Every structure is written in structure tokens, then in C-alpha cells.
Amino acid sequence: MGVMWGLISVAIASLAQLSLGFAMMRLPSIAHPLAFISGLGAFNAATLALFAGLAGYLVSVFCWQKTLHTLALSKAYALLSLSYVLVWVASMLLPGLQGAFSLKAMLGVLCIMAGVMLIFLPARS
């Protein structure tokens, strides 16, 4: 049950990260606070994505709390790294997120996936 909550948390956090990325590419820079606040007031797709991303992180925290009640921290923490994989892949596949493929990034993703699999391998008796 803990793994399920962990995977739900990772999926929601990944969607939240993608939403925030979408919003930040379209809203005015935070370096210009008045323009940024004005952009928030426009309540367009970017503003909606910003608030959806923030809400997603909040929901993800509740799922993560459920995860930590039922799964060892060493295993739960390994699940978090799957978010990097999901965001990397989604940023390349979804239009407008400007993700770029590189062999270096692919090697990093493969290392993350191998590490998670090693942690979740059944222990030898």
C-alpha cells in the first residue's frame, strides 16, 4: 500500500512540476514584481497552471505522508527520484515545454532507474 501512495505522490508532484514549468515560461519574470503580479491578475492559462501546480504539490505532500506511514524511508525516498525521470520524458513529449534529448541525460535517467530497481529488489535470505 505504501508503494502505491508513493507512486501517486510522485505522479502528482511530476504533474505539478510540469504545470509550474508551463506557467513560468508564460508569466512575466519574477524579477519584475509588478509585471508578475499583473500577470497573475490576468487569470489566463499560465495563472491557472501556476495555481494547479501549487495545489498539486500540496496534494502530493498528503500522499507522501501516507507513504511514510507504511513504507520504510529508504525505499520511499528512492521512489522520489522517479519524478526526475517522468518530468524529463514528459518535457520532451509535451508541446511547449522545450525539453531536449541528450545522451548524458539519458544515462542519468538509466542510472536513476537502475538504482530504484536495486533498492526494491527482494532481499536474499
From Swiss-Prot:
Residues exposed to the Cytoplasmic side: 1-2, 55-76, 122-125
State where it is primarily located.
Answer: membrane
Gene3D superfamilies according to UniProt: 1.10.3730.20
A GO MF annotation of the entry reads: carbohydrate derivative transmembrane transporter activity
State the pathway, as annotated in the record.
Bacterial outer membrane biogenesis; lipopolysaccharide biosynthesis
Keyword annotations of the record: Cell inner membrane, Cell membrane, Lipid A biosynthesis, Lipid biosynthesis, Lipid metabolism, Lipopolysaccharide biosynthesis, Membrane, Transmembrane, Transmembrane helix, Transport
Where found in the cell?
Answer: Cell inner membrane
Query: For this UniProt entry, which segments traverse the membrane?
Result: 3-23, 34-54, 77-97, 101-121
Q: Which GO terms describe its cellular component?
A: plasma membrane
Per the record, what ranges lie on the membrane's Periplasmic side?
24-33, 98-100
The record's note on what follows loss of this gene reads: No change observed, indicating that it could be not necessary for the Ara4N addition to lipid A and polymyxin resistance.
Instruction: Tell me what topology the record assigns in the membrane.
Output: Multi-pass membrane protein
Q: Which InterPro entries match?
A: Flippase_ArnF, Small_drug/metabolite_transptr
Biological process according to GO: lipid A biosynthetic process; lipopolysaccharide biosynthetic process; transmembrane transport
User: Which NCBIfam families does the record associate with it?
Assistant: PRK02971.1-2 (NF002816)
Share what the entry says about its subunit structure, partners included: Heterodimer of ArnE and ArnF.
* Function comment: Translocates 4-amino-4-deoxy-L-arabinose-phosphoundecaprenol (alpha-L-Ara4N-phosphoundecaprenol) from the cytoplasmic to the periplasmic side of the inner membrane.
Family designation: Belongs to the ArnF family.
Q: What is this protein called?
A: Probable 4-amino-4-deoxy-L-arabinose-phosphoundecaprenol flippase subunit ArnF
Q: Which organism is it from?
A: Salmonella typhimurium (strain LT2 / SGSC1412 / ATCC 700720)
Organism placement in taxonomy: Bacteria, Pseudomonadati, Pseudomonadota, Gammaproteobacteria, Enterobacterales
The gene for this chain is arnF
